[in-house]
Amino acid sequence: MKKFLFMCAGTLVAVAAFAQEPTTNWPYLYPEFKEGELNVRSKTEKALFNIHLDLGALHYVEDGRIKEANILNASTLVIGNDVFRNVAGKMLKVLVRAQGGYIVEETRATYSAVVRNDGAYGTTALNSTTTKTFLYNENAINQYNGYLMTDVYKDLLAMRDDAEKLPVRKNLYIVIGMDQIPADKKSVASLSGLDKKALKAFLKSEKIDWNEIGDLVKVIDYIIANRNK
C-alpha cells in the first residue's frame, strides 16, 4: 500500500479540536475565527477565517464584521494545522492526500435536530429575518450561507454559548481530479469506466471499511489504476 503523503493532525485529535461545540448562535467549525491564509490564484489573502456549517461558506472578519469570502478562484485555505481545498465551491478539510487524489471531510450542521415541532429555533423562528442577519455576497458561489444573530463579530462571539448545542454530521468524500465521490460502496460502484465485477472482487478481498482512511486510500489507488481500462 502506498504511503500517505499528507495527513492533517486534526484527524488524530478531533475531540480536542471541538472543545467548544457549535451552537445555534454559533454555527461554525471553530469556536472563534482564526488566522488563516486563503490561496487565490497567485495571491495569498490573510484574515480571520471560519467555516459556516450550513453550506460550507467561508466567512472572514473585516473591520469587526463577518463577511462571506468569494472562493470562486480560491484553491486552498490553511488554518493552523488544518488544510482545506475548494471542492465544488465548498472549503472541505483535507484528511489525507494520496497519489492522485484526496480524502476530504465535510462537517455539516443538523438543524432539524434543534427545530421543535412549533417551528422554533432556540427562541426565534428558523426563517426569521427580523432577528437574524442574512449575509449575502453577490460574487460568491454560495449565495445563501445561513442566518446569524448579528454580523458584528464581537457581539456574535458573546452570544455563542447562550444557545442550544448544534449537532453536526461528518461526510467523507474521495476527490480525484474534478470528481467528488461520496465515500461509500454505492457511489464508487456507480462511477463510469470501472468494471463492476472486478471492483466488487477488490472490495471484498481488501475488506474495505468505508470509515477507515487507509482503506479509502486503497480505493483511490484502485480507481486511478483501473478506470477506463
Residue spans of the language-model regions?
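Bacterial Sec-dependent N-terminal signal peptides
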Residues: 1-23, 219
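Short, solvent-exposed mixed-charge patches
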Residues: 20, 228-229
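Short N-terminal segments immediately surrounding and downstream of signal-peptide cleavage
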Residues: 21-39
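Residues that act as N-cap/strand-start positions at coil-to-secondary-structure junctions
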Residues: 30-32, 41-45, 71, 168
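Glycine-rich, compositionally biased intrinsically disordered regions
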Residues: 34-40, 44-51, 58-60
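Aromatic-patch recognition
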Residues: 49-180
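A short, solvent-exposed beta-edge/loop patch
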Residues: 155-220
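C-terminal alpha-helix
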Residues: 222-226
